[in-house]
Amino acid sequence: MPQGDPQGEPAFREAIRGYLHSARGVNCTAEQIVVGAGTEYLLMLLSRILGPDHTIAMENPTYKQAYRVFESLGYPVVPVEMDGSGLETSLLEGSGADIAYVMPSHQYPTGIVMPVKRRQELLSWAYKKEGRYLIEDDYDSEFRYKGKPIPALQGMDGRERVIYSGTFSKSIAPAIRVSYLVLPKPLLAVYKERVNFYTSTVSRIDQNILYQFMVSGCYE
């Protein structure tokens, strides 16, 4: 059996695209999706796309594994304090960071849900300077304890500044090491130039099983 598409099987990526659009309000094409074995792997892949000269801002407290990945890759990491609405954008401006890693839908470990106004402030920060990006980790958006979910930050972005990250590990089982990135179109072009030769780290068999699960309607 051939190795398949480095980004993930086209039909599987199209199923992810359809689900993200209907469930999370994410606006993308299947071509913008990159499938990989776990969020940590995809963050390492993302580092090859972004390059070395960046400073990463992260919510304090945050997901320690992502913090360790960024540190191990040599990025300066700046913790930014939160209030009841999430990461404080006024502090972000003075942090010196040009990339911010955030979990607006259900911040880990605090559980804060970032309101729309704060999300708009984050986007305004990203738009102020060329080369700024937001990494949106939407790791467990399928779960809600009360109220309706707020659509993803990516769906509010009109200037291609949000890198969206999702996973099947929380919604199905931790052993399902299948995650995905939605790359802004400018970064997709860089991906194809720099790392498109990497073989997909998720087997075609696993991708097809998940694809069948999604198109059958069982996932939703």
Question: What kind of feature is each model-predicted range?
Answer:
Residues Y145-K148, A175-R177:
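Short aromatic-enriched loop/helix-cap "lid" or pocket-rim segments at secondary-structure transitions
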Residues G8, Y145, T201-I205:
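A generic short alpha-helical patch detector that favors 3-5-residue windows
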Residues D137-D138:
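Walker B catalytic acidic pair
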Residues K64-V69, A97, Y133-L134, R144, ...:
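A generic "structured core" feature
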Residues I163-E220:
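PLP-dependent aminotransferase class I/II
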